[in-house]
């Protein structure tokens, strides 16, 4: 599993409850641009529409060697999941305070996959608590390394 893009903001903004692996419908120039590592999914989110899941605000830069048939950088893109997963996500997405956020894009058997997560939004106190825990864990690891 070779990671292409990661959403560093997702784990800071949301409590991740469940993850899914989804395929994504891309054009040739989008795949070439992703191979070059040109994109970001920091502001991306997914929505269920007509029993299909669509990814919004995923920015994949235009391919540098592309011609006039190049893709739109912020176009909505269809995610490919099984029907039972879509129906499960449809129920979850309807709950207030829950969101479908992409955690990463990665290669699997030559195809681009999306790690999609169900997240519940954090408030400011939760974010501060997460930062404190991360800092204390880092200090603990450093003291353990010094004692060796």
How would you label these PLM feature ranges?
Residues 2-48, 52:
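A positional/architectural concept
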Residues 21, 31, 46, 60-61, ...:
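Residue-level signature for short turns and capping positions that connect secondary-structure elements
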Residues 50, 58-93:
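Compact, glycine-rich, soluble single-domain proteins
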Residues 74, 81-87, 120-148:
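C-terminal end-helix/capping segment
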């Amino acid at each position: 599993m070779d990671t292409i893009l990661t959403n560093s903001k997702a784990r800071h903004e949301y409590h991740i409850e469940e993850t899914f692996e989804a395929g994504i419908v891309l054009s040739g120039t989008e795949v070439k641009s992703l191979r070059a590592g040109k994109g970001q999914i920091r502001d991306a989110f997914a929505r269920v529409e007509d029993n299909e899941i669509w990814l919004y605000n995923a920015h994949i830069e235009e391919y540098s060697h592309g011609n006039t048939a190049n893709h739109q950088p912020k176009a909505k893109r269809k995610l490919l999941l099984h029907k039972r997963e879509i129906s499960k996500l449809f129920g979850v997405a309807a709950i207030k305070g829950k969101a479908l956020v992409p955690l990463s894009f990665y290669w699997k058997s030559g195809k681009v996959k999306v790690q999609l997560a169900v997240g519940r939004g954090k408030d400011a106190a939760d974010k501060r608590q997460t930062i404190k825990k991360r800092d204390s864990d880092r200090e603990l690891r450093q003291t353990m390394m010094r004692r060796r």
